[in-house]
Each structure stands twice: as structure tokens, then as C-alpha cells.
Amino acid sequence: MSAVSSQELAGLDVFADIPAQDLEALAVHLQPLRAAAGEVLMRQGEIAASFSIITSGRVEIRHVAPEGQDVVTELLPGSIVGEIALLRNQPRTATVLAKDDVCGYRGYNRAFECMLAMPVVAERMVCTARQRLAAYIAPIPVLTGHGDGLFLRPVLPGDAERFHSSGSFSRQTLYRRYQGGAPTEARLAYLFEVDYVDHFVWVVTDGGDGPAVADARFVRDEDDPTSAEVALTVADAYQGRGLGTLLLVALAIAARVDGIRRFHARVLSDNPPARALGEKVNARWGQEEYGVITTAGDIPDLDDLPLDYDTRLRIEQVARQVIHAFD
């Protein structure tokens, strides 16, 4: 009899909506895990043989980049750690340290195969792994002609809180962007916890660890994988600095990397900034319904985008790192 209960597994968020009986094969291949506060569970650079599911206690994820800077993240109970190296078949990307006394489960190859055999679980793991890898990427400094210390990077889950608490977006800006009021908590989770493949988001921050002051995204069409809807938002105090154009170009670069060839958008007809931005890229507007206009067009070749070569190349490299992290 397994020392791990499938009923206990079914209570974890990562296995939400999966019946306990469907987790019995996985439970057989898991072992109980206990670690004291301060104990190292995994080390960056080592060959990966296992993953862990944390059910109680916090763990610290510490990644040392090639340039020497540390990226530290704290994970709460319900998290999976060690899965990135197994998914990529590469050495571990970070060190995992128990911040509290930790309990959970440890699994090896057979257990990981059981995880991957459940499509919903595999999709959740890959999405979370992409988000963690995105956190290791150094933000790209951007110049807007105002001497700002602004940075461009892929969105991270914590950006939902940065967006919600920054107070940089007026009611009018939020209304124009979301065609209604401020987004709900559930809506924010959708907007900022993305998979980077079918839903990709860039954010601009004021300072390396500062608030998110602009974001831009594309969401791939279900009926046409080469087409995507785009949307962007720029905080009021940062409008008129060229951020909208920069973000649209960055989206075009990421979309090309992701196999998308055509963009379309829906905006309120009383949204002058969006219309002005569209006219810069020769958008042709059409009426869809009262108060809403649409535009669509092919994404230009990268060589035709209005951005210097070095910045364009860096944006392309970053996009490729997250979009093709598991290719």
C-alpha cells in the first residue's frame, strides 16, 4: 500500500478537478518528504533526478545568473519544485532551500511520467515553469527620450499586485483598456499569469524592481494559430513618451518568434491614444458595433520594424527564451 494518499493529492491546487482515483498511479510512486528549516533540497547545476511537491512550509528558490546577480523567489505550500530540470532534461536552474520545516512528497522518473500523462497537470506545470524561467531573465533597459529608467521584460505573476496597487492608471485609462471598470482579481490572474505561448505579455517597469507602468499582450486565436488579438495599456503619467509604439514593436517581435503572422484589435471609438498609435502603423479601422472599432493587419518583417538592431535583437532573444523554453 502506498505511503501517499491519492485523496491527499486530490486536495492540492495542482491536482484541482482531478478525481482521487486518477491519482492512484502517481501516489504509488511518490515518497513522503520532510526537511528541516535551512536544509537544501536541490542545488543549482546538479543533475536532476527528482521533483518535490510542497504541502506545508515555505521554500526559497535562488538562481544565480551568469552575470552573478541573484534572483530569489519564495514559494508557498502547494508548489512543485525541481520540475524545470526534468522538463528540459538539463541541470537544475536554481537552489531550493527550506525556509520553514517543510513537508510534502518527492518523486522520481516514474512519478514524473505519471504527472506528464495527465494533460491538465502537465499544462499547469509547464506554464508555471515558464513563469519561473521568465523571472531569471534580465530586464531590457529602454530609452523613451525622457531620460527614464524604464525596463522591458516578460510579465511575471507578481505583476498583478504591482498593477493593482500602483495607482498609476486612471479610471478613464482602465475604462478605455478594459471597456469597463478596473479588472477583478480573477481577471488580473488571467491577465498576468500567462503561458507565454498562446498568451504573451510584455510589461514596462519604472526601475528594475519598480511598478508596472505599461503592458502589452497578444492572445492567439483558437481558430487560427497564426493570428492573435492585441491590447496594451500605458499609465497616464507615461503616455506620450513612445511606450505604446515600443510595446507594439516588441509584441510584433515576440509574435514572429511564436509563429504568429497577423494581429487584430478591438478598441473603444473614444480612445484617442489607441487610434493615434494605430495610425502610426497604418491601421485601417472598421466599425464592429456601436462604440467599438476594429483593425487587423499582417505583422511587418522584423527588418521593417522601427527599432534599432541591438534592441530588436535583445527583445527577440528574450522572447525566444520564454516562448521556446521547452522546445
Segments (PLM) and residue ranges:
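Regulatory nucleotide-sensing modules
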Residues: 6-66, 81
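Cyclic-nucleotide recognition modules
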Residues: 72-127
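A short, internal acetyl-CoA/4′-phosphopantetheine-binding micro-motif in the GNAT/acyltransferase core
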Residues: 81, 97, 222, 231-240, ...
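Terminal substrate-recognition subdomain of acyl/acetyltransferases
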Residues: 114, 123, 128-134, 138-148, ...
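A short beta-loop-alpha structural element at the N-terminal edge
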Residues: 151-165
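Acetyl-CoA-dependent GNAT
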Residues: 180-229, 235
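Conserved acetyl-CoA-binding loop-helix of GNAT-fold acetyltransferases
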Residues: 234, 240-255, 280
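Conserved GNAT acetyl-CoA-binding A-motif
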Residues: 255-268
